Amino acid sequence: MKNLFRTAALMVPLSLALAYGAQAKEIPIGKPQLLGGMEIAAVYLQPIEMEPEGMMRPAKDSDVHLEADIKAAKDNTNGFAEGDWVPYLVVSYELTHLDNGKVQKGDFMPMVANDGPHYGDNVKLDGPGKYKLKLFVSPPSANQHAHFGRHVDKETGVGPWFKPVTAEYEFVYAGTGKKGAY
């Protein structure tokens, strides 16, 4: 009986470690930037399987999943509390391989994962090397097909939307399975 309890006591921490060890490791890209009343942080991790299928490049055809974590800053005038995810933004990216000058562009989509909502896309990189990432972030009013209302009356109104902003970062991609990669 004693051995049964000892085995159970060892199995619980081990199973928890294995469960949490399976989580994806996010690699920060530069430092978060404060722009337009928002904190804009960029990360990458291994490519992600998404639903609905076909909403972005399949994970098997991608090198990384790029993410923009965009949260309201303390000075936000649009009614969001500090740290709130800011929805309905229009986010696109430009990724330049600084070693060869090749540029690729795309759009980030809003999505949710176990660490919360963010904007992202699966991306096929142009091999290992140094990259420059530009994130172009526009307010909800930039998308004429997605409506996100804003109170403008004297009693309950919020400030006007921010002007579009650009966050720029540089990072080294070592390749999959390499130190400094995921």
Swiss-Prot record:
The keyword Signal applies. Residues 1-24 form the signal peptide. Pfam families: Iron_transport. Gene3D superfamilies: Periplasmic metal-binding protein Tp34-type. Keywords: Signal. It comes from the Bacteria. Belongs to the UPF0423 family. This is UPF0423 protein BAB2_0840. It comes from Brucella abortus (strain 2308).
